[in-house]
A protein has these predicted regions:
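Pyridoxal 5′-phosphate
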Residues: 1-132
């Protein structure tokens, strides 16, 4: 495979020596080396529950967690870091949007458009909202 097709492939260790085209990101996304290194550093230096304690390691984890929220806020140009909500995964995030927002705002006659190729985690919540 021509490595010039996607210059970002080099950032993903799994894709270095494999011509794979990984498209199952709804289930598990591949991580670039910088993310793998950051997660490793967290586990080595600050592995504690953020927002759960007042001991030094928990406070450090909380600060890193809130710093990440601010980084995401700046990256997506959100008006405030309070607009950034972390979820465990895409499924949880989609359920949160579908059941806490859409269920109360989508009205009869509104259309919810999803592709037939969608992962069930993105199809089923919208079907449930539509059936209500």
């Amino acid at each position: 495979m021509d490595k010039t097709i996607n210059p970002w492939r080099k950032d993903f260790p799994l894709l270095q020596n494999d011509p794979v085209m990984y498209l199952d990101n709804a289930a598990t996304a591949q991580r670039p080396a910088c993310v793998i290194e950051a997660v490793k550093a967290f586990y080595e230096q600050a592995n504690a529950n953020p927002l759960r304690g007042f001991y030094p390691l928990s406070l450090k984890a909380t600060q890193m967690y809130e710093d990440a929220r601010k980084t995401v806020q700046r990256f997506i140009h959100a008006p405030s870091e309070r607009c950034v909500i972390f979820t465990r995964n895409t499924t949880e995030g989609l359920n949160l949007v579908a059941y806490s927002y859409a269920l109360h705002h989508v009205k009869a006659g509104d259309e919810i458009v999803v592709s037939i190729m969608e992962h069930h985690s993105n199809m089923l919540p919208w079907q449930m909202v539509a059936s209500q």
